[in-house]
């Protein structure tokens, strides 16, 4: 039963995240007058298809993705779409449908329109993340966690080194705290159990350098930090819920960028990379705890996909936007041969990283270090 729940939850999350991403590309392409030849949910052989205003809407066998095939776009998706070179998908498109394909090819759209089309997928991932977090925060029984200290424990080291009841935590180690979890995340990253705080005290900003925290050791000899203070809860007014949801999107997005930066700086080990197997394992664990954990993981994954897709990497939407920025500045498109070579190399690198991350996942499963 647990395997079925994991499988169902994984399909739900991956399906929702990818479908909303592709819908973003689809909707903005339509708004910009670009011809959309196919909008597909799923991959592989066609199960159901219908036509409307020159666009084929398809449900395919494998619920592991989706795609949008745009006229004038050189991509595997366009090749799979009917009317391209995908010859195993059934009969040719009816002539009356082809006659309705009056939109312009993507490569003939204005540069700014192409940039909007490329960015729209990631934007919709952020929108989905916001909606999921909005529902999650609204439906939870607990109040919103604020950044204002309610009380500092007696003899707590953090109180002896600067923090006071009533302080509103603004930043930790120079990083602005949008939500309470920003503070906790930054404290987790510190290896010395001390940090520089910026707080708002009596209406003015106060710098508190070198705030230190108590520690304790478990039976395995591992050291843990004790926070030493509690914070106020916030009432769930509509404004507070909206602000917390928007700030939580920023929080999750920044975690992803910070993790990548830590990886490049050597602060995090490449052995910590996780791939599809690890994600499915995490989904299974979340599903065993309840819908709230699944929803929070859905929010994290969709925001993760949005952030990663905007990275200036040739195989990603962000890389395509960089090519378009170069075209906008110079007035000349980057030669297709150069774009193609960079994209192939980037895909090879990403595929290699995915294989390595999958290897890490399998090792963790076998050794029990999940």
Language-model-detected regions and their locations in the chain:
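PDZ peptide-recognition modules
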Residues: 4-5, 80-113, 117-120, 124-273, ...
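Membrane interface segments of multi-pass transport proteins and intramembrane proteases
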Residues: 47-50, 148-152, 325-341
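Hydrophobic alpha-helical segments of integral membrane proteins
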Residues: 39, 60, 64, 115-119, ...
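Alpha-helical transmembrane segments of integral membrane proteins
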Residues: 6-9, 13, 300, 346-353
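Small-residue-rich helix-interface/hinge motifs
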Residues: 3-92, 311-330
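Small-residue-enriched transmembrane helix starts and helix-helix packing motifs
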Residues: 290-307
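Juxtamembrane boundary at the C-terminal end of a transmembrane helix
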Residues: 356-370
């Amino acid at each position: 039963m647990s395997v079925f729940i994991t499988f169902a939850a994984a399909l739900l999350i991956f399906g929702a995240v990818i479908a909303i991403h592709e819908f973003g590309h689809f909707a903005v392409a339509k708004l910009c007058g670009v011809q959309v030849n196919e909008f597909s949910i799923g991959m592989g052989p066609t199960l159901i298809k219908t036509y409307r205003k020159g666009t084929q809407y398809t449900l395919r066998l494998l619920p592991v993705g989706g795609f949008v095939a745009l006229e004038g776009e050189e991509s595997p998706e366009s090749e799979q779409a009917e009317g391209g070179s995908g010859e195993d998908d059934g009969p040719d498109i009816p002539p009356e449908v082809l006659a309705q394909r009056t939109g312009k090819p993507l490569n003939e759209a204005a540069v700014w329109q192409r940039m909007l089309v490329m960015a729209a997928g990631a934007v919709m991932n952020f929108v989905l993340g916001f909606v999921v977090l909005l529902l999650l925060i609204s439906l939870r029984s607990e109040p919103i966690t604020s950044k204002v200290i309610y009380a500092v424990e007696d003899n707590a080291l953090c109180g002896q080194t600067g923090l006071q009841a009533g302080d509103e935590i603004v930043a930790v180690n120079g990083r602005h705290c949008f939500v309470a979890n920003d503070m906790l995340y930054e404290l987790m990253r510190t290896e010395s159990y001390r940090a520089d705080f910026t707080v708002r005290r009596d209406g003015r900003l106060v710098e508190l350098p070198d705030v230190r925290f108590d520690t304790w050791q478990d039976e395995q000899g591992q050291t843990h930090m004790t926070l030493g203070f509690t914070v106020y809860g916030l009432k769930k007014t509509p404004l507070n819920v909206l602000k917390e949801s928007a700030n939580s999107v920023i929080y999750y997005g920044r975690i992803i960028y910070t993790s990548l930066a830590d990886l490049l700086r050597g602060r995090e080990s490449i052995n910590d990379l996780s791939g599809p197997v690890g994600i499915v394992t995490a989904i299974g664990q979340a599903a065993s705890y309840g819908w709230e954990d699944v929803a929070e993981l859905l929010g994290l994954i969709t925001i993760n996909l949005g952030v990663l897709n905007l990275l200036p990497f040739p195989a990603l939407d962000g890389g395509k936007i960089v090519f378009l920025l170069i075209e906008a500045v110079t007035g000349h498109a980057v030669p297709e041969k150069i774009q193609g070579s960079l994209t192939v190399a980037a895909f090879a690198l990403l595929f290699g990283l995915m294989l390595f991350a999958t290897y890490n996942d399998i090792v963790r499963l076998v050794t029990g270090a999940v």
